[in-house]
A protein has these predicted regions:
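Flexible, low-complexity charged segments
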Residues: 1-108
Length: 108
């Protein structure tokens, strides 16, 4: 029998993107849900949420609009997000976040 999935919704992020040659003043509005390994992982994430959100804000603000265009770009951002969240958890040697799901993605 497969374990019941555990999800954690994060508050929406609104960040200014890094300007590139063609665009400046671009904004990313992004909503995420994390699929985590267990209820214990969710509790650990909630405990360290300010640090995790800070890491994600930095990650998102380092992107350009061109880097976020297309399905492959979104898949790459999801992978980077998963890596950043897992790296922000203290003392963890295995991935605790197993998937990143976008529930809002607006590039302005």
């Amino acid at each position: 029998m497969e374990a019941t999935p555990v999800y954690m919704d994060l508050d929406t992020f609104t960040v200014s993107l890094k300007p590139d040659a063609h665009d400046s003043d671009r904004i990313l509005y992004i909503g995420l849900t994390l699929k985590v390994a267990s209820a214990e992982t969710k509790a650990l994430l909630e405990k360290h949420l300010p640090e995790t959100r800070s890491h994600l804000l930095v990650l998102f603000s380092q992107q350009t609009a061109a880097e976020l265009t297309g399905d492959q770009a979104k898949a790459l951002l999801a992978a980077k997000t998963k890596d950043a969240v897992n790296a922000s958890l203290p003392g963890q040697h295995k991935p605790m976040v197993t998937n990143v799901l976008f529930n809002a993605f607006i590039l302005r």
